[in-house]
Each structure stands twice: as structure tokens, then as C-alpha cells.
Amino acid sequence: MANSAQARKRARTALKQRAHNASLRTAFRTAVKKVLKAIEAGDKAAARVVFQASEKVIDRIADKGVFHKNKAARHKSRLSAQIKAMA
């Protein structure tokens, strides 16, 4: 239990930030799933459009520090490779 006023405030702030980060991670997962769904459907044009939207989400999460920038780059690279591999 936080004893000082500063520690109590940091505990409150941490809870708020944890909830915000959770929503960002959820947005990331949703964006990736949309791209994968478009890839499975075989629609390359739609996959590109959805991928561009998901890139923004992934970059934003990396900038905020929720994910490491290398993890974000890895996800973008793998999704891009899957789109390029489509016939």
C-alpha cells in the first residue's frame, strides 16, 4: 500500500496508464487481425488498404512505448511480406 501522497498519486496514475495501454494493445491486435483476414480472403487491394491503416496503429503504439520499436517493425515487416507473397 502506498504510504506517501506521491506514491498514492503514482498508483492512481499507473492504473489509468495501464487501462490506456490495454486499449492500445487491443487496437493493435484488432488491426493485425483485419490485415490477416484480408490476406486469407485473397483480396490484395483490400489487404494493402487495411495494412496502411494498421501501420499507423502499430507506429503509434511503438512511439508511445507500449511495444518496443523492433517489435512494431517486425510485425509490419511480416504483414508486408505476406501481402507481397499474395498472387
Curated annotation (Swiss-Prot):
* Biased segments, Basic residues type: 7-19
Q: Which UniProt keywords apply?
A: Ribonucleoprotein, Ribosomal protein, RNA-binding, rRNA-binding
Q: Where is this region: Disordered?
A: 1-20
Q: Does the keyword Transcription apply?
A: no
- Similarity comment text for this entry: Belongs to the bacterial ribosomal protein bS20 family.
Q: Report the protein's function.
A: Binds directly to 16S ribosomal RNA.
Q: What is this protein called?
A: Small ribosomal subunit protein bS20
Q: Which organism is it from?
A: Chromobacterium violaceum (strain ATCC 12472 / DSM 30191 / JCM 1249 / CCUG 213 / NBRC 12614 / NCIMB 9131 / NCTC 9757 / MK)
Q: What is this organism's lineage?
A: Bacteria, Pseudomonadati, Pseudomonadota, Betaproteobacteria, Neisseriales
The record's gene field reads rpsT
